[in-house]
Regions:
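Serine endopeptidase catalytic core focused on the charge-relay Asp
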Residues: 106
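Short, conserved active-site loops that position catalytic residues or coordinate cofactors/metal ions
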Residues: 71, 102-103
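Acidic, polar ligand-binding/catalytic clefts
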Residues: 75-101
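C-terminal motif of bacterial Sec signal peptides marking the signal peptidase cleavage site
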Residues: 2-6
Length: 270
Protein backbone atom coordinates (compact mmCIF):
# COMPACT_ATOMS: atom_id res chain seq x y z
CA UNK A 1 0.00 0.00 0.00
CA UNK A 2 1.60 3.26 -1.11
CA UNK A 3 0.86 6.87 -0.12
CA UNK A 4 2.84 10.11 -0.96
CA UNK A 5 3.07 4.95 30.17
CA UNK A 6 4.90 8.20 30.65
CA UNK A 7 7.00 9.66 27.96
CA UNK A 8 10.31 11.50 27.94
CA UNK A 9 10.39 12.86 24.40
CA UNK A 10 13.29 14.58 22.73
CA UNK A 11 13.29 18.38 22.49
CA UNK A 12 10.72 19.92 20.21
CA UNK A 13 11.20 19.73 16.45
CA UNK A 14 11.29 23.17 14.87
CA UNK A 15 10.03 24.36 11.51
CA UNK A 16 12.09 23.64 8.41
CA UNK A 17 14.36 26.54 7.45
CA UNK A 18 16.03 25.02 4.39
CA UNK A 19 15.11 22.34 1.88
CA UNK A 20 17.01 19.11 2.64
CA UNK A 21 19.64 18.04 0.11
CA UNK A 22 17.73 14.78 -0.39
CA UNK A 23 14.10 15.62 0.49
CA UNK A 24 12.49 12.26 -0.37
CA UNK A 25 12.14 9.63 2.35
CA UNK A 26 10.82 6.05 2.23
CA UNK A 27 9.00 4.87 5.36
CA UNK A 28 8.22 1.15 5.66
CA UNK A 29 5.56 0.65 8.28
CA UNK A 30 2.65 -1.48 9.40
CA UNK A 31 -0.82 -1.42 7.92
CA UNK A 32 -2.21 -0.37 11.30
CA UNK A 33 -0.48 3.02 11.25
CA UNK A 34 -1.83 3.56 7.74
CA UNK A 35 -5.34 2.11 8.13
CA UNK A 36 -5.97 3.97 11.40
CA UNK A 37 -5.29 7.30 9.70
CA UNK A 38 -2.34 8.15 11.96
CA UNK A 39 0.13 8.70 9.13
CA UNK A 40 -2.32 10.83 7.15
CA UNK A 41 -2.45 13.03 10.25
CA UNK A 42 1.26 13.11 11.11
CA UNK A 43 3.16 13.15 7.83
CA UNK A 44 1.94 16.49 6.40
CA UNK A 45 3.02 18.10 9.67
CA UNK A 46 6.41 16.36 9.51
CA UNK A 47 6.87 17.65 5.95
CA UNK A 48 5.88 21.15 7.01
CA UNK A 49 8.43 21.11 9.84
CA UNK A 50 11.36 19.45 8.06
CA UNK A 51 10.96 19.76 4.29
CA UNK A 52 11.04 15.99 3.80
CA UNK A 53 8.32 14.32 1.75
CA UNK A 54 7.52 10.75 2.71
CA UNK A 55 6.54 7.79 0.55
CA UNK A 56 4.85 5.30 2.83
CA UNK A 57 4.94 1.57 2.12
CA UNK A 58 2.45 -0.09 4.47
CA UNK A 59 3.08 -3.82 4.87
CA UNK A 60 3.36 -6.29 7.72
CA UNK A 61 6.20 -5.78 10.19
CA UNK A 62 8.08 -8.82 8.86
CA UNK A 63 8.03 -7.42 5.33
CA UNK A 64 8.97 -3.95 6.55
CA UNK A 65 12.01 -5.35 8.36
CA UNK A 66 13.00 -7.28 5.25
CA UNK A 67 12.73 -4.10 3.19
CA UNK A 68 15.20 -2.54 5.61
CA UNK A 69 17.59 -5.48 5.26
CA UNK A 70 17.34 -5.17 1.47
CA UNK A 71 17.99 -1.41 1.54
CA UNK A 72 14.53 -0.65 0.15
CA UNK A 73 13.46 1.74 2.93
CA UNK A 74 15.13 4.55 4.87
CA UNK A 75 13.29 4.27 8.17
CA UNK A 76 10.89 1.78 9.79
CA UNK A 77 7.89 2.26 12.09
CA UNK A 78 6.90 -1.24 13.20
CA UNK A 79 5.56 -3.31 16.10
CA UNK A 80 7.41 -6.52 16.93
CA UNK A 81 9.95 -5.41 19.52
CA UNK A 82 12.07 -8.57 19.80
CA UNK A 83 12.42 -8.74 16.01
CA UNK A 84 13.24 -5.02 15.90
CA UNK A 85 15.97 -5.41 18.52
CA UNK A 86 17.43 -8.33 16.57
CA UNK A 87 17.32 -6.17 13.42
CA UNK A 88 19.52 -3.57 15.14
CA UNK A 89 21.80 -6.16 16.80
CA UNK A 90 22.50 -7.70 13.39
CA UNK A 91 23.52 -4.31 12.00
CA UNK A 92 20.52 -3.72 9.76
CA UNK A 93 19.37 -0.69 11.76
CA UNK A 94 21.39 1.96 13.57
CA UNK A 95 19.20 2.35 16.67
CA UNK A 96 15.69 1.62 17.93
CA UNK A 97 13.39 3.67 20.15
CA UNK A 98 9.92 3.12 21.59
CA UNK A 99 7.46 5.57 20.02
CA UNK A 100 3.96 4.66 21.20
CA UNK A 101 1.76 1.76 22.14
CA UNK A 102 -1.80 0.58 22.04
CA UNK A 103 -3.20 -2.92 22.46
CA UNK A 104 -4.59 -5.84 20.57
CA UNK A 105 -8.17 -6.98 21.07
CA UNK A 106 -10.27 -9.97 20.07
CA UNK A 107 -13.34 -8.94 18.10
CA UNK A 108 -16.21 -11.03 16.86
CA UNK A 109 -19.94 -11.12 16.11
CA UNK A 110 -22.10 -8.99 18.38
CA UNK A 111 -24.26 -12.05 19.09
CA UNK A 112 -21.21 -13.65 20.77
CA UNK A 113 -22.63 -17.17 20.46
CA UNK A 114 -19.66 -18.58 22.41
CA UNK A 115 -20.24 -16.12 25.26
CA UNK A 116 -16.57 -15.15 25.16
CA UNK A 117 -17.06 -11.70 26.65
CA UNK A 118 -18.75 -12.99 29.80
CA UNK A 119 -16.69 -16.16 30.18
CA UNK A 120 -13.22 -14.87 29.40
CA UNK A 121 -13.27 -11.05 29.57
CA UNK A 122 -9.52 -10.43 29.59
CA UNK A 123 -8.24 -14.01 29.11
CA UNK A 124 -7.15 -14.16 25.48
CA UNK A 125 -5.71 -17.70 25.65
CA UNK A 126 -8.98 -18.98 27.12
CA UNK A 127 -10.96 -17.23 24.41
CA UNK A 128 -8.87 -18.69 21.62
CA UNK A 129 -9.18 -22.17 23.14
CA UNK A 130 -12.98 -21.81 23.12
CA UNK A 131 -12.87 -20.73 19.47
CA UNK A 132 -10.70 -23.72 18.58
CA UNK A 133 -12.78 -26.21 20.61
CA UNK A 134 -15.96 -25.03 18.86
CA UNK A 135 -14.28 -24.69 15.46
CA UNK A 136 -15.73 -21.19 15.18
CA UNK A 137 -14.47 -19.27 12.16
CA UNK A 138 -11.32 -17.26 12.90
CA UNK A 139 -9.58 -15.00 10.37
CA UNK A 140 -5.80 -14.69 10.71
CA UNK A 141 -3.69 -11.97 9.12
CA UNK A 142 -1.40 -14.70 7.79
CA UNK A 143 1.10 -12.12 6.56
CA UNK A 144 4.05 -12.19 8.99
CA UNK A 145 2.92 -8.85 10.41
CA UNK A 146 3.35 -7.82 14.03
CA UNK A 147 -0.30 -8.66 14.60
CA UNK A 148 0.13 -12.08 13.00
CA UNK A 149 3.23 -12.77 15.11
CA UNK A 150 1.32 -11.83 18.26
CA UNK A 151 -1.62 -14.05 17.31
CA UNK A 152 0.64 -17.05 16.69
CA UNK A 153 2.42 -16.49 20.01
CA UNK A 154 -0.91 -16.52 21.86
CA UNK A 155 -2.05 -19.73 20.16
CA UNK A 156 1.28 -21.27 21.17
CA UNK A 157 0.90 -20.11 24.78
CA UNK A 158 -2.49 -21.86 24.83
CA UNK A 159 -0.90 -25.08 23.45
CA UNK A 160 -3.06 -24.90 20.34
CA UNK A 161 -1.95 -25.31 16.75
CA UNK A 162 -4.76 -23.67 14.77
CA UNK A 163 -5.66 -25.65 11.66
CA UNK A 164 -8.76 -26.70 9.79
CA UNK A 165 -11.53 -25.20 7.72
CA UNK A 166 -12.48 -22.90 10.59
CA UNK A 167 -9.06 -21.15 10.56
CA UNK A 168 -8.74 -18.80 7.60
CA UNK A 169 -5.39 -17.25 6.65
CA UNK A 170 -6.08 -14.04 4.75
CA UNK A 171 -2.57 -12.87 3.86
CA UNK A 172 -3.90 -9.32 4.06
CA UNK A 173 -3.66 -6.11 6.04
CA UNK A 174 -5.72 -5.34 9.12
CA UNK A 175 -8.49 -3.37 7.42
CA UNK A 176 -9.10 -6.15 4.89
CA UNK A 177 -9.08 -8.81 7.62
CA UNK A 178 -11.67 -6.90 9.64
CA UNK A 179 -13.89 -6.68 6.55
CA UNK A 180 -13.52 -10.43 5.94
CA UNK A 181 -14.31 -11.23 9.58
CA UNK A 182 -17.35 -8.98 9.37
CA UNK A 183 -18.61 -10.66 6.19
CA UNK A 184 -18.12 -14.13 7.64
CA UNK A 185 -19.25 -13.18 11.16
CA UNK A 186 -15.94 -14.54 12.36
CA UNK A 187 -13.43 -13.75 15.09
CA UNK A 188 -10.07 -12.05 14.67
CA UNK A 189 -7.31 -10.34 16.63
CA UNK A 190 -6.79 -6.70 15.67
CA UNK A 191 -4.97 -3.66 16.93
CA UNK A 192 -7.42 -1.36 18.71
CA UNK A 193 -6.64 1.67 16.53
CA UNK A 194 -7.66 0.08 13.23
CA UNK A 195 -10.79 -1.40 14.79
CA UNK A 196 -11.91 1.92 16.27
CA UNK A 197 -11.30 3.71 12.97
CA UNK A 198 -13.60 1.19 11.20
CA UNK A 199 -16.02 0.34 14.00
CA UNK A 200 -19.01 2.22 12.58
CA UNK A 201 -18.85 0.12 9.40
CA UNK A 202 -18.49 -3.24 11.13
CA UNK A 203 -20.89 -5.64 12.82
CA UNK A 204 -18.11 -6.74 15.17
CA UNK A 205 -17.57 -5.83 18.80
CA UNK A 206 -14.75 -6.13 21.30
CA UNK A 207 -15.07 -9.43 23.16
CA UNK A 208 -11.71 -9.82 24.91
CA UNK A 209 -9.37 -7.02 25.96
CA UNK A 210 -6.99 -6.08 28.74
CA UNK A 211 -4.82 -9.21 28.84
CA UNK A 212 -1.17 -8.25 29.42
CA UNK A 213 -0.28 -10.48 26.45
CA UNK A 214 -2.16 -8.06 24.18
CA UNK A 215 0.22 -5.11 24.73
CA UNK A 216 1.29 -3.60 21.39
CA UNK A 217 4.50 -1.54 21.34
CA UNK A 218 5.66 0.42 18.27
CA UNK A 219 9.26 1.38 17.54
CA UNK A 220 11.18 3.55 15.07
CA UNK A 221 14.43 2.39 13.43
CA UNK A 222 16.64 4.24 10.92
CA UNK A 223 18.02 1.71 8.43
CA UNK A 224 21.80 1.32 8.41
CA UNK A 225 23.02 3.47 5.49
CA UNK A 226 25.46 0.69 4.58
CA UNK A 227 22.44 -1.37 3.40
CA UNK A 228 22.30 0.60 0.15
CA UNK A 229 23.72 3.58 -1.69
CA UNK A 230 20.33 5.26 -1.86
CA UNK A 231 19.54 5.10 1.88
CA UNK A 232 18.56 8.58 3.09
CA UNK A 233 20.05 8.43 6.57
CA UNK A 234 19.70 12.16 7.24
CA UNK A 235 16.00 11.96 6.42
CA UNK A 236 15.58 8.82 8.52
CA UNK A 237 17.17 10.49 11.54
CA UNK A 238 15.05 13.60 10.96
CA UNK A 239 11.91 11.45 11.02
CA UNK A 240 13.04 9.61 14.13
CA UNK A 241 13.90 12.84 15.95
CA UNK A 242 10.60 14.44 14.94
CA UNK A 243 8.34 11.57 16.00
CA UNK A 244 10.21 11.27 19.31
CA UNK A 245 10.10 15.02 19.92
CA UNK A 246 7.68 16.71 22.29
CA UNK A 247 5.67 17.94 19.31
CA UNK A 248 5.50 14.53 17.64
CA UNK A 249 4.54 12.81 20.88
CA UNK A 250 1.83 15.37 21.65
CA UNK A 251 0.36 14.94 18.16
CA UNK A 252 0.21 11.16 18.67
CA UNK A 253 -1.55 11.73 21.99
CA UNK A 254 -4.13 14.00 20.31
CA UNK A 255 -4.90 11.69 17.39
CA UNK A 256 -8.33 10.09 17.69
CA UNK A 257 -9.51 11.96 20.78
CA UNK A 258 -11.94 14.25 18.97
CA UNK A 259 -13.48 11.50 16.83
CA UNK A 260 -13.36 8.50 19.17
CA UNK A 261 -13.18 10.07 22.61
CA UNK A 262 -9.80 8.43 23.27
CA UNK A 263 -6.33 8.43 21.71
CA UNK A 264 -5.71 5.55 19.31
CA UNK A 265 -2.04 5.39 20.34
CA UNK A 266 -0.32 6.33 23.62
CA UNK A 267 3.07 8.04 23.18
CA UNK A 268 5.95 6.61 25.22
CA UNK A 269 9.18 7.76 23.58
CA UNK A 270 12.43 6.86 25.29
Amino acid sequence: MLSAMGCTPKTDAGDATTTPENPELILATTTSTQDSGLLDFLLPLFTEDTGYTVKTIAVGTGKALQMGRDGEADVLLVHAKSDEEKFVEEGDGTERHDVMYNDFILVGPKEDALNLKEQFGNDIAGGLKAISDNMATFVSRGDDSGTHKKELAIWKSADIEPAGDWYLSAGSGMADVLKIADEKQAYTITDRATYLSMQSDLGLEILIEGDENLFNQYGVIPVNPEKGETINNEGAVAFMDWILSEKGQNLIKEFGVEEYGQPLFIPNAN
